[in-house]
């Protein structure tokens, strides 16, 4: 089996073929996801909440991400694997490069960082040194204390700022962008404006791809359930069928529906 590359996702965007991605944190689930057809996975700092039981992503360390990256890579050797750089792991370009190198050595193909135009120098530093970068705009969970909670971003005048940030990051060299919890109308503007693939979560069905936290897809999230989440396991009956249903619904545009979207 050939490894999945960013070129495949670029081709999907050009051909307007939606693609499904998911978070993964261990060998067994990564193997299951790969076997059922998911070719792109994210070792997200969401593991701080879903795996470690914290109330935010802030306690997650680079060592945590590297540990889970190694496990996922063993389970899905051919997937395109993205790994988060966690809170305060990229305060300077030099720090970002050191920590990105550790995560790449663990098996990541690309690192994801949260933030806007202030990250331009960091993105350039990484890409010039052969570290592919995925950006993340909108609701960026590492900034939860600044936002005052998990709220929809990019409404009103903030939408233009977000679009400008996306264009600046693309010009700096990011190869993917995650858009989280933004109005559908803004998600479409960003997706149309960028030449790189855009992956949405809580951004409607207008982005090139979708991502879900695996616990949300299986309905095993404790506490608050995000509006954009859907429990595919309740309809499918078993985990493998749930993954296949998730992929099919993303590719057809059925998911996310209006009930999962913001305006």
From Swiss-Prot:
EC nos: 2.1.2.11
Residues given in the record as 3-methyl-2-oxobutanoate binding sites: 45-46, 84, 112
Pfam families: Pantoate_transf
Residues forming the catalytic site: 180
Protein name: 3-methyl-2-oxobutanoate hydroxymethyltransferase
Cofactor or coenzyme needed: Mg(2+)
An MF annotation (GO) of this entry: magnesium ion binding
Organism placement in taxonomy: Bacteria, Pseudomonadati, Pseudomonadota, Gammaproteobacteria, Enterobacterales
Keyword Lipoprotein tagged: no
């Amino acid at each position: 089996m050939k490894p999945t590359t960013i070129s495949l996702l670029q081709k999907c965007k050009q051909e307007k073929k939606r693609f499904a991605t998911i978070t993964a944190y261990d060998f067994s689930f990564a193997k299951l996801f790969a076997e059922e057809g998911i070719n792109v996975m994210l070792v997200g700092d969401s593991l701080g909440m879903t795996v470690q039981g914290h109330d935010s992503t802030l306690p997650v360390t680079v060592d945590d991400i590297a540990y889970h990256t190694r496990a996922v890579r063993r389970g899905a050797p051919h997937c395109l694997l993205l790994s988060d750089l966690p809170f305060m792991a990229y305060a300077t370009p030099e720090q970002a490069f050191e920590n990105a190198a550790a995560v790449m050595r663990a098996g990541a193909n690309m690192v994801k960082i949260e933030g806007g135009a202030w990250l331009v120098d960091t993105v350039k530093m990484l890409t010039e040194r052969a570290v592919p970068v995925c950006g993340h705009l909108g609701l960026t969970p590492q900034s939860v204390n600044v936002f005052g909670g998990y709220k929809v971003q990019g409404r009103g005048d903030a939408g233009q700022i977000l679009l400008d940030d996306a264009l600046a990051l693309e010009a700096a060299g990011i190869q993917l962008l995650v858009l989280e919890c933004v109005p559908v109308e803004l998600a479409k503007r960003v997706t149309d404006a960028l030449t790189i693939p855009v992956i949405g979560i809580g951004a409607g069905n207008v982005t090139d791809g979708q991502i879900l936290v695996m616990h949300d897809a299986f309905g095993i999230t404790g506490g608050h359930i995000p509006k954009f989440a859907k429990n595919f396991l309740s309809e499918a009956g078993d985990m493998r069928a749930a993954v296949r249903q998730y992929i099919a619904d993303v590719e057809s545009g059925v998911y996310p529906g209006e009930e999962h979207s913001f305006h």
